[in-house]
Amino acid sequence: MKLDDSSLQKFGFIKRDTLGSINIDPLQTGGRLTEAAKQALVEWGDGYSVCDFCGGILDQIKKPPIYDFVHKALPEFLDCDEARVTNGARESKFAVMHSIGKPGDWIVLDGLAHYSSYVAAERAGLNIKTVPHSGSPDYYLDPEGYATAIEEVTKESGKPPALALVTYPDGSYGNLPDARKIASVCHEYDVPLLLNGAYAVGRMPVSAKEIGADFIAGSGHKSMAASGPVGVLGVSEEYAPIVFRKSKYNKVKEVELLGCTARGATVMTLIASFPDVVKRVRNWDQEVENARWFSARFEEMGFIQRGQKPHSHDLMFFEAPRFYEISEKVKKGRYFLYKDLKARNIHGIKSGLTKYFKLSTFGLGKEKLGIVADSFEEILKKYEDV
Amino acid sequence: MKLDDSSLQKFGFIKRDTLGSINIDPLQTGGRLTEAAKQALVEWGDGYSVCDFCGGILDQIKKPPIYDFVHKALPEFLDCDEARVTNGARESKFAVMHSIGKPGDWIVLDGLAHYSSYVAAERAGLNIKTVPHSGSPDYYLDPEGYATAIEEVTKESGKPPALALVTYPDGSYGNLPDARKIASVCHEYDVPLLLNGAYAVGRMPVSAKEIGADFIAGSGHKSMAASGPVGVLGVSEEYAPIVFRKSKYNKVKEVELLGCTARGATVMTLIASFPDVVKRVRNWDQEVENARWFSARFEEMGFIQRGQKPHSHDLMFFEAPRFYEISEKVKKGRYFLYKDLKARNIHGIKSGLTKYFKLSTFGLGKEKLGIVADSFEEILKKYEDV
């Protein structure tokens, strides 16, 4: 591409078509900015803005209160000993895997682990053993499966895995496994546990200490109303000196964080939304109630909710055999659902999906959820003769 | 910290004190957002905004034109075969080091390399050999030093280093080494070269192919008028399959990028500013002229510019013996300069520095640079009897 005026025209400011829609994509519902975060974004948008206030260590900046946020508020919020801000949950996971494991070591992942957990382990050179789930319809994860997996690794490789990970909840079905029991099983074998809380931290109460997780990863752009990429990482006292070890070349810089991570608008939007995020987490029971109400309405229409029931998270997976039937017959084929939802200003079911899809009810409230449910009902009706 | 209403009050939206000042911090001058980027920031601020348009691979998104940007515009701009967007220049460097080197391998760095190059190499488990510079006043980097360093590594470790890196320009003196000659020296030994262009890409013309660099790293928040953390990485055809290798667990995700990198406002501000960035790079001769004019005015006042002369970059290092003298005598001590500049609405010389400091003239234009130079002159005058 020659970079002339004509080709450059396609870049510059670009509108975001989905901005005004009701978005039920699980990736988006917890990442919508608060008003304070929108203001922070404009205020701190320039490149390295927070570095104007930095004496050499990002998380030691006193004003703006990054120090208080990272070293006082975050450990309290995650209920862990030490915390840092990272470039995302996957970067948090990689930092843990890369510092706790050595290439050739093993890691145990739950069978519903996010692809980024696999990729992070692969990047760290770790071999992967998965704990199977029970499959459809519950996708239940038996904590005892961790014992079996750890024993298998030990038998095959001569030593226990370096690390275990559990996804809490998983990103497909929104299942909340018994993380506390899993931590206890792992600890019986002296295997530390990393809790991937990308869909938990910032949405629902979660305590690393109560669970017994040695590490906890959260996502700012997924669940903490922040502009990404930004994440959080909590580590126990025992492992903090390893994960947050300092460079031998530069005494104040932490190796796994490459010195500095979120250094600008991202950390400032995380801080801006934090008071609201703390408050919304306290409102989690209402979110669960909304999710259950929504699931019940969907089931009344003949959709089948997969995963835990009654459900305890806003992320839900549905099977919609009737939509699949329709897609086989209508002109627009498998794109009919996406288009009919778009016409109703609803976004978030991936284009082309009909038989199976996931969605999230988080933060939408009963009124908007009602509009979504009514819209699905209308679409069913529209095609009732098909 | 108990997360109650009183403690949460310190978070939320926070003002940025330096927003209206003339900022000469080298970290800031190339990262100021364009108007288009400010608009993009607000439009695309929410968490995972671009993922609404993603079919599974970030850099394949057609609308917004991330695909065209990453696969057509960026390779042209960097003059390399393949490019990607990353979470920053240091993350670009780590991705290269981690995929090209194995723990225990060696890397050759120039003696003026940024700390993040050291930390990235350390994180990748690489041993570091540095190419010495000539020291004060020029800090000249002899390309032949790379031959010596490579030979030393080969002698000591039994094999050549996995990689060499050159900082172009360095972040202390703004020196532009003879990167083309360095590439040619490295290639004589079959050692690939990574060009750290965090202060070049987006400010001045730079061509990976003309230089002969196998890899080129750039920074969005440092030099491409983008809201960070965001960076770019260019790789030659030969090494692209290694650095951008796909996961064995997920066929579309690239391991070194952990699947996805800049997935939201950061990539959209990079794209928003891109047309202006392409244009400002064409204006580089004027920037160099401004830097030289500024340097001359500073030298007239008795400050001494260190590093290359005549200078060919906006980042400059000054020695100011007179300011040091003043700082020894005045009440405010070494903070007098910071405070006197602040009173004149100028920011960017680190608080407490007087004898040595660096600054950048980039993008400020003659008028603002005149104000800065006049202000330094006034401050000298203010203390002339001290």
UniProtKB/Swiss-Prot annotation, chains A, B:
It comes from the Archaea. It catalyses: O-phospho-L-seryl-tRNA(Cys) + hydrogen sulfide + H(+) = L-cysteinyl-tRNA(Cys) + phosphate. Homodimer. Interacts with SepRS. Its cofactor is pyridoxal 5'-phosphate. Pyridoxal 5'-phosphate binds at A89, R90, N196, S219, G220, H221. It comes from Methanosarcina barkeri (strain Fusaro / DSM 804). Gene3D superfamilies: Aspartate Aminotransferase, domain 1, Type I PLP-dependent aspartate aminotransferase-like (Major domain). Transmembrane segments: none annotated. One of its GO terms (biological process) is translation. Keywords: Protein biosynthesis, Pyridoxal phosphate, Transferase. Belongs to the SepCysS family. CDD domains: SepCysS. The modification N6-(pyridoxal phosphate)lysine is found at K222. SUPFAM superfamilies: PLP-dependent transferases. The keyword tRNA processing does not apply. Its EC number is 2.5.1.73. GO terms for molecular function: Sep-tRNA:Cys-tRNA synthase activity. This is O-phospho-L-seryl-tRNA:Cys-tRNA synthase. Pfam families: SepSecS. Converts O-phospho-L-seryl-tRNA(Cys) (Sep-tRNA(Cys)) to L-cysteinyl-tRNA(Cys) (Cys-tRNA(Cys)).
